[in-house]
């Protein structure tokens, strides 16, 4: 059995991690994509319009992009084929239904705790010291916690690694991370807080070179994105899928909750709660006055996410969907990508080349419609209607 866990494009290569016969593999592939151009002969390949096309390989990925750039605007000359080269690579190498072993996929749930000397930590400056990092292995259930102060550990399923300071914490964490090499990391609000803060703070303390050790390929990228009118920071760690369990929960449970705080979701779904620390006036008082309880608080957070997955199986669903569509795990959040991959593979099996992608002006904006949030509940005499209007010229 051979299956991938992540495929990442870097220049002209596809960087692939996965498992073969139970053992981890890691490969760098020089990839030569296949495109299709109109043909006058019966080549065995057609378009959706029933026109003959023939396959060509202009060269590596960079040459294919240059070929697109050069000929896409030529009138009457259409270039067919999948231009997402990761999807094309996966389809080329996994043409049959993908068989996979969930027990081999290394899934971590992760949570961090940070100083709050100046209020809630900010991922854009990462000015506050990292105090704790906890990780739970989903398959073994073992928890490893890195902390900067002594802790009285009384649990056999927890390994507490006491660190001299923050620099020592990051160094020991990186050693563990490289040795264990997770395939998929999850957590609650992980994508917009825990991972960006680890990356930002580590870069500030250890430098960019050391931070790149987070990726098995040495590639860590950060970008700003806008969500609900707010600018957020998002990190990409090449070779590792970062799946926010909060986003999974919102997308695949099909329920509306009055709050999406982990404490509320854990209570609703599991009948469990985060560790209460209301006896302290501030979060700073919490970690300065009762370190042992503070560590337990951090550990419980990774356990709650792990138990949510045990019950809901949303990561399992995500993995199944990705392999069915032949995509990366993170692509399940993007409906267009998923349908692109599904359609491409369906047509490929029938020797039909996917049509060329229409080039649009991304700067052109269109007025959007107001979307009213529905009120969940049972209703009688429901009507479904659609209204449209056209501006009078």
Which residues does each predicted region cover?
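Active-site-proximal helix-loop-helix substrate-binding element of RNase H-like nuclease domains
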Residues: 143-145, 152-160, 164, 181, ...
């Amino acid at each position: 059995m051979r299956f991938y866990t992540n495929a990442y494009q870097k220049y002209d290569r596809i960087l692939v991690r996965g498992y073969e016969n139970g053992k981890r593999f890691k490969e760098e592939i020089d990839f030569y994509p296949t495109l299709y151009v109109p043909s006058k002969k019966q080549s065995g390949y057609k378009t959706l319009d029933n026109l003959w096309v023939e396959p060509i390989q202009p060269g590596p990925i960079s040459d294919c992009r240059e070929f697109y750039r050069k000929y896409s605007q030529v009138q009457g000359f259409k270039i067919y084929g999948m231009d997402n080269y990761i999807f094309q690579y996966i389809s080329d190498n996994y043409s049959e239904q993908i068989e996979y072993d969930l027990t081999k996929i290394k899934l971590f749930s992760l949570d961090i705790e940070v100083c709050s000397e100046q209020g809630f930590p900010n991922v854009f400056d990462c000015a506050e010291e990292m105090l704790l990092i906890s990780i739970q292995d989903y398959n073994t259930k073992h928890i490893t916690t890195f902390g900067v102060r002594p802790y009285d550990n009384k649990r056999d399923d927890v390994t507490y690694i006491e660190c001299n300071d923050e620099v020592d914490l990051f160094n020991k964490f990186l050693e563990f991370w490289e040795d264990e090499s997770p395939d998929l990391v999850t957590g609650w609000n992980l994508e917009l807080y825990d991972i960006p803060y680890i990356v930002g703070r580590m870069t500030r303390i250890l430098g960019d070179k050391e931070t790149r050790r987070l990726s098995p390929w040495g590639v860590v990228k950060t970008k700003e994105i806008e969500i609900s009118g707010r600018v957020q920071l998002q990190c990409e760690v090449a070779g590792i899928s970062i799946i926010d369990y909060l986003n999974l929960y919102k997308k695949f449970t099909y329920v509306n909750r009055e709050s999406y705080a982990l404490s509320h979701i854990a209570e609703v779904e599991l009948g469990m709660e985060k560790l209460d620390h209301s006896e302290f006036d501030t979060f700073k008082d919490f970690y300065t006055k009762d370190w042992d309880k503070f560590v337990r608080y951090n550990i419980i957070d990774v356990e709650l996410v792990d138990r949510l997955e045990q019950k809901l199986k949303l990561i399992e669903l995500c993995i199944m969907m990705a392999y069915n569509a032949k995509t990366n795990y993170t692509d399940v959040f993007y409906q267009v990508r998923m349908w692109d991959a599904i359609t491409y593979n369906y047509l490929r099996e029938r020797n039909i080349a996917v049509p060329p992608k229409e080039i649009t002006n991304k700067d052109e904006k269109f007025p959007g419609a107001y979307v009213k949030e529905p009120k969940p509940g049972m209703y009688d005499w429901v009507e479904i209607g659609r209204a449209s209007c056209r501006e009078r010229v």
